C-alpha cells in the first residue's frame, strides 16, 4: 500500500477499521490536489465535479438532496441503552435502534465497498476547544466528499497530524446499498448508522454531504452534555469588547443573516459548544443555503463562493455561470467553504468567552408573538424545549395559513439525549455567566406583513448593546411575556402585537389557538419531573 499525503505523518494502517488490500491512501490532501481529483475527465456520475465561473467546484448529490432521517439508526447496546433518547410510540424521533448483528452486516457492506480501492482519508477535529473536541477520521473513495470534510471540520496542523488518533471514524460507502434491508426491518436500502461503542458511523446509498457533518453533530450532542457542556444548534458572534451572543433558530428564522453583522465577528454559523472557558465552534467551515442567493443581499456568502468552496445541487449553465434562483432540483442548494472565506471572523481560533446574550429566533406566521420579549430562566427552558417557528403554507384554495413547527432545542433532528438535558445544561451555563435570554419574532404581525429586517436588526442591536434593559415594559397575557414599549430605532407601534390588529379580539383568538398548540406540544416533555415543573412557564389558557 502506498501512502500519498500532503503531510509527513506516519503511514496509516486502515486494517484496524476493517479495510484490506487498500491500493493507495491519499491522506489530508491539499485543496490543489482535491481540485484536480474531483474534476478529472474520467470521472462519471455523482463523483464528477464541474468548475463554475466563480472558481468553486459544483457537484450533484443524486436523489438525496438533504439528510435522510428515516434511514438513521443507532446500535442499542450497553453504551447507549440508558442515555440515548430512543424513539417511542408516544414520542417519535430519529433515534431508531438496531442490533449489533444488523450493524455487523452493514459494516461488512461498507468495508467491502472501500477495501481494495484508492481511498481518501481526512483527519480533522470537531470542536475548537482541544479539551473537549472529537478527533474525526473520514474515509471515502470519492474526492469531493473528502473536500467537503476538509471544508467543514477543523483542519489539523502538521504536528497534530503526526500523532493523530481518531476518537470517531466515519466510513462513507455512498456507492453501496443494503440488499437485506427488508428482512432487517429497516426503512430502505440506504443507511446512516452509528455505533457508539465502536465509535463509528457508516453511510451507504446517500451521497448528501451533510450526513457526515450532522452525524458528528449528533455525536457531540451525545458526549458533551453528559460532561455538563452545552451542545447547541446555533450561530454565535462576538462584539469589539469580547461580548458573545448566540442565536438559536430553525431554518428560515434569520439565524445566519442576523449573526452576520458588520459590527461583530463571526464565531460560527451552525454548531457550538459552551464549556468552562466559553463558547466554541464545532466546525472549521460553513454550510450555507444558496437558493436565491445574490451578491447584493448576502455579499459575505456570495464572496465566499470561490476556489476551494464546494457547491451542491446548483444549476450550472454550459458557460460555467450559476443560476442560484433555480430550485428545480431542490430548494436545499448548498455551498461548503472554509470559515476563513468569511472576512469578519474570530481568529485564530473560532471561540469566545461566555455568552451574555442568548437569542431564540422564531418566525411566527400566526402573527401572535411580540417582536421581542425577555425570558425568565424557566421561560428560557420552556421556549428552548418548544423550539417554535411557523411558516405560511398555501392550501389548495389559495389561502395561506400558518403551519407550526416545534423542534426541541431548535434542532430536534440532531438530539441524542432527552431534550430536557440540553435545556438544563444551557440554563446552568447561562446562570453561571449571568446571561439573559430573549425570544425574538422575525415573522409576521397583525398587519399581515413580515416584521421588517430593519426593525429586527434594531431589536438585536438593543439586546446586544444593553439598551433593552433600560426600556419600560408591559405584560402580554396568555403567553405571559414581558415586552419593551420602546426601543431605539424600532417602530414602537409593533412592540405590542395587539396594537397591530384593527380588532384586538382577533389577536386574542389567534393567541389562544397558538397557545393551545404550544401546550399540546409540551405534553411530551411532562414525562419527567424537569418537564412537569416548566408547564407554568408556558402559555396559560383559563
UniProtKB/Swiss-Prot annotation:
Annotated pathway: Carbohydrate biosynthesis; gluconeogenesis
Single GO term (MF): phosphoenolpyruvate carboxykinase (ATP) activity
Entry's cofactor comment: Binds 1 Mn(2+) ion per subunit.
Binding site for Mn(2+): 214, 233, 270
Cofactor(s) demanded: Mn(2+)
EC number, as in UniProt: 4.1.1.49
Enzyme class: lyase
Subcellular location: Cytoplasm
This protein's UniProt keywords: ATP-binding, Cytoplasm, Decarboxylase, Gluconeogenesis, Lyase, Manganese, Metal-binding, Nucleotide-binding
Reaction(s) this enzyme catalyzes, per UniProt: oxaloacetate + ATP = phosphoenolpyruvate + ADP + CO2
One example of a Gene Ontology biological process annotation: gluconeogenesis
Pfam families: PEPCK_ATP
Broad class of the protein's primary localization: cytoplasm
HAMAP family per the UniProt record, alphabetical: PEPCK_ATP
Reported function: Involved in the gluconeogenesis. Catalyzes the conversion of oxaloacetate (OAA) to phosphoenolpyruvate (PEP) through direct phosphoryl transfer between the nucleoside triphosphate and OAA.
Family statement: Belongs to the phosphoenolpyruvate carboxykinase (ATP) family.
Name of this chain's protein: Phosphoenolpyruvate carboxykinase (ATP)
Originating organism: Vibrio parahaemolyticus serotype O3:K6 (strain RIMD 2210633)
Lineage: Bacteria, Pseudomonadati, Pseudomonadota, Gammaproteobacteria, Vibrionales
Gene name as annotated: pckA
